[in-house]
Regions:
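CBM-like carbohydrate-recognition segments
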Residues: 2-41, 55, 60-62, 71-89, ...
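Short, solvent-exposed segments of well-ordered alpha helices
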Residues: 32-36, 85, 137, 141, ...
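Extended ligand-binding groove/face enriched in aromatic
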Residues: 63, 74-202, 337-344
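Extended ligand-binding clefts on enzyme/binding-domain cores
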Residues: 144-145, 152-268, 275-283, 301-348
Length: 377
């Protein structure tokens, strides 16, 4: 039996050791000496902490989130370290917490920042069939992670400020990914799709080579969070997303390691030499399974399956050293290209070559997300 109270202490340590300009969880920035800026990694953590605040009603959580985000958002709504003209969908993810902060604090600058980010959504370059490019520097490319980064923010804006006028567009972008990036035999999604079929990493269909766990995790979480924010009045669009989500979750279940109850870094390659059980993607799928069961969009038994995956992570990678908890088994980063970085070619060998770290928010954020669902079982 896992002692979940130690996870509360772990979360508190992350908060206590962090300032807005030096978040302890952003290992990638620390490793590369990057200046702090608006990013999806902090966004993932802020969203998780806000959920904990709503569950516990402990003021320290909302105070921390407000102080953290306030540092990045100026009075005119401009955002420290954010450049709209890069059209990078990753930058939309941290915008999710702005909706909550605007409601909690009434600070107009948060609404102005929301509108700034929505202007990116409106101008984001698209493929000919309507999907957002992942970034301006990656023409015609759709990455699974981008559906989480953009569509959840997009859905919240539509639901809260635009009367749901673009719910069709949101559902269509998920449907396009399902139709073009889903391997119906393996029941898994490829990481990337180049509509133009020009990228060095793609095959004749424009697809990358492998099934990278965290990208599948991002997409799955993107689906369930979008479903959660889309109102019941959007009946047709929501039904489309629920059908995709059910097929996705049912397809993933077969890849859970029977002994360790986690997923592998390259999902379908199991114990192939160099492959490893990976924390961030496992936590995301655990979260999606439990949340999907709670929302009633997948069979209730997935609450138990998700709980087992979460407990598998705790047993495998949650350790104590010098009185402090550490969460390991986290892939630091992975991507596709650009042309100047041909190492990032979507191969099995590439995905297992990226650093494995402890306590990075790409793992701790989803871990805390999954924990918020554990607390609702």
């Amino acid at each position: 039996m896992i002692n979940y109270s130690i996870i509360d202490k772990y979360i508190d340590r992350l908060i206590d050791d962090t300032t807005p300009d030096k978040p302890i969880w952003n290992i990638e920035n620390i490793k590369h000496g990057k200046a702090p800026g608006w990013n999806y990694i902090d966004g993932c953590m802020m969203t998780s902490l806000y959920t904990i605040y709503k569950q516990t009603d402990k003021k320290k959580y909302i105070d921390f989130i407000d102080k953290f985000v306030d540092y990045y958002v100026f009075d005119d709504g401009s955002i420290r370290g954010y450049a709209l003209d890069t059209y990078n969908v990753d930058n939309l993810n941290e915008g999710r917490v702005l909706f909550d902060l605007y409601r909690e604090t009434g600070k107009e600058k948060y609404k102005k920042a929301i509108d700034l980010l929505y202007s990116q959504v409106q101008g984001q370059p698209r493929t000919p069939i309507g999907n957002f490019w992942h970034k301006k520097i990656y023409p015609e490319q759709v990455w699974l992670d981008g559906l989480y980064m953009a569509q959840v923010f997009y859905t919240r804006y539509e639901a809260e400020f635009n009367g749901g006028k673009n719910f069709d567009d949101i559902a269509r972008q998920f449907q396009n990914v399902y139709d073009n990036m889903y391997d119906k035999q393996k029941r898994l999604y490829y990481h990337g799709w180049d509509y133009s079929k020009k990228a060095f990493w793609c095959n004749e269909k424009g697809l990358s080579k492998s099934f990278w766990l965290r990208s599948v995790g991002w997409y799955t979480v993107g689906l369930v969070d979008t479903i959660g924010y889309m109102p019941d009045s959007a009946k047709e669009q929501k039904a489309k997303l629920v059908a995709i989500f059910k097929d996705t979750i049912e397809g993933l279940e077969q890849y859970i390691d029977k002994d360790k109850k986690m997923f592998w870094q390259v999902v379908d390659q199991g114990e192939r030499r160099g492959n490893y059980l990976e924390t961030s993607g496992s936590a995301m799928i655990a979260y999606a399974m439990m949340k999907g069961a709670r929302l009633g969009v997948v069979d209730k038994r997935y609450a138990k399956v998700g709980e087992e995956v979460f407990n598998g992570i705790c047993k495998q990678y949650l350790t104590e050293s010098d009185g402090k908890l550490n969460l390991g088994g986290i892939c630091l980063m992975a991507g596709l290209g650009p042309e100047t970085n041909r190492k990032r070619d979507g191969s099995f060998e590439y995905y297992i070559s990226e650093p494995i770290v402890e306590n990075d928010a790409k793992g701790t954020g989803p871990f805390v997300m999954a924990y918020t669902e554990i607390k609702q079982l």
